[in-house]
């Protein structure tokens, strides 16, 4: 089953890459740009077929993909042009001016990438990452609204029998200890709380807020027990808890009064509505952006995990090999098949979200770097027009290729470090 999970992730990976490149391909053709190649993978070609003026194929190493567009860069002083790969890694070994001059055919003068208006070039380069974002959103919504996610529910897991300090064992209740509000009200394990103080809710966070907001109050609590609705009455205890700021962070040394009922909630798989799903995805995108920004700070710990005896944290950067291992572990978990499928779909969705964010970095040779170049050209031309100066012409992105080589070199080193860590000290979910 472990191997099956890895194979399934590889299929998801290939589809995600093909889907990304399809975004570039479709928009390039829509704007009349000639695309000689559409390839999934690198290395030797396993299969290819030419349709129209594009060769479609699959290569042996399934760790990337690319399309080739004619005239990616403006011609140099000698008037020569080239076709360049959209793949960052393949682009490292291509000369920005001369490698594909021979691919130009009669009539290509009107089918060059750099001759398209900047907004069209932005669309072509953005289309690839955008396809990954769309796929991630669709997969997330499928799981959230179709399967649900594991979260705390309003069902009672256990009831505290007495009110004691947090440092004491809740199972050791002395006769002198006061009964907890939940126990005094007759709340039992298995009860599903339907309403609190007249407010009906099936959301744990909302229920928790209602309890905290009513210290010292006598409130009715409606529960479902064995298919019947029962109204209990609880006197909410007063508790002093640490104050939190607007971001949910604890404010040191400050406390507030909050209500306490005295029970633990059960965890269950809960389907989300559309609004809840959008909120959840927004939080995950924010987390992904924060993790991307924190990558440089995590490199020392990653190095220690790969070459030392440091632990591999759950939020450690993970590459394709590490994600494939996680896919294999999911397939071996002793959980229902539907839950395995949901976890696997979430893994592929997260991978696509990462692809979107990573490719949008405004650095060559990534898609975001070409987008930044097109936007800069648009700004230069607009400024020249306002100031009534001569049109400066296309922005020569090829001049930034030395920077692109440095960026690509850093990416390669980081990828190798992650690969070693994924092999010798992988992130585990079990």
Curated annotation (Swiss-Prot):
Coiled coil: none
PROSITE patterns named in the record: ZINC_PROTEASE (PS00142)
Compartments, as annotated in UniProt: Cell membrane
EC number(s) given by UniProt: 3.4.24.-
One GO-annotated biological process of the protein: proteolysis
Primary location: membrane
InterPro entries the UniProt entry points to: PDZ, PDZ_6, PDZ_sf, Pept_M50_Zn, Peptidase_M50
Binding residue positions for Zn(2+): 20, 24
Spans through the membrane: 122-144, 341-363, 402-424
One CC-aspect GO term: plasma membrane
Active-site residues (renumbered): 21
Family stated for the protein in its record: Belongs to the peptidase M50B family.
Protein's recorded name: Putative zinc metalloprotease SCO5695
């Amino acid at each position: 089953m472990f191997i099956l999970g890895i194979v399934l992730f590889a299929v998801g990976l290939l589809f995600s890459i093909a889907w990304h490149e399809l975004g570039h391909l479709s928009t390039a053709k829509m704007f009349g740009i000639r695309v000689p190649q559409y390839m999934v993978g690198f290395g030797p070609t396993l299969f290819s077929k030419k349709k129209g003026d594009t060769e479609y194929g699959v290569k042996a190493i399934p760790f990337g993909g690319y399309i080739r567009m004619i005239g990616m860069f403006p011609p140099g002083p000698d008037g020569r042009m080239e076709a360049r790969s959209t793949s960052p890694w393949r682009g490292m070994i291509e000369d920005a001016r001369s490698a594909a001059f021979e691919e130009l055919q009669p009539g290509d003068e009107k089918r060059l990438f750099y001759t398209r208006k900047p907004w069209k070039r932005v669309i072509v380069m953005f289309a690839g990452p955008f396809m990954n974002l769309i796929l991630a959103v669709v997969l997330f919504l499928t799981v959230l609204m179709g399967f649900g996610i594991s979260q705390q529910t309003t069902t009672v897991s256990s009831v505290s029998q007495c009110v004691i300090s947090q440092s004491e064992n809740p199972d050791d209740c002395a006769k002198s200890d006061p009964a907890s509000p939940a126990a005094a009200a007759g709340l039992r394990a298995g009860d599903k709380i339907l309403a609190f103080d007249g407010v009906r809710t099936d959301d744990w966070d909302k229920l928790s807020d209602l309890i905290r907001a009513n210290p010292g109050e006598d409130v009715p609590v409606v529960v479902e027990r064995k298919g019947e609705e029962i109204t209990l009455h609880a006197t909410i205890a007063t508790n002093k808890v640490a104050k939190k700021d607007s971001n949910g962070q604890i404010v040191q040394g400050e406390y507030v009064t909050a209500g306490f009922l005295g029970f633990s909630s059960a965890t269950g798989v809960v389907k989300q509505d559309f609004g809840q799903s959008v909120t959840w995805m927004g939080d995950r995108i924010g987390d992904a952006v924060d993790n991307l920004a924190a990558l440089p700070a995590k490199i020392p710990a990653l190095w220690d995990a790969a070459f030392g005896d440091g632990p591999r944290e759950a939020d450690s950067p993970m590459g394709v090999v590490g994600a494939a291992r996680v896919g294999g572990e999911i397939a071996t978990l002793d959980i229902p098949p539907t839950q395995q499928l949901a976890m696997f779909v979430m893994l592929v969705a997260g991978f696509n979200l990462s692809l979107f964010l990573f490719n949008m970095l405004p650095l060559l040779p990534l898609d975001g770097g070409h987008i930044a170049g097109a936007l800069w050209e648009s700004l230069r031309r607009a400024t020249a027009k306002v100031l009534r100066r001569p049109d400066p012409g296309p922005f020569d992105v090829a001049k930034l290729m030395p920077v692109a080589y440095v960026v690509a070199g850093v990416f390669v080193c980081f990828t190798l470090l992650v690969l070693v860590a994924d092999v010798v000290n992988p992130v585990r979910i079990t």
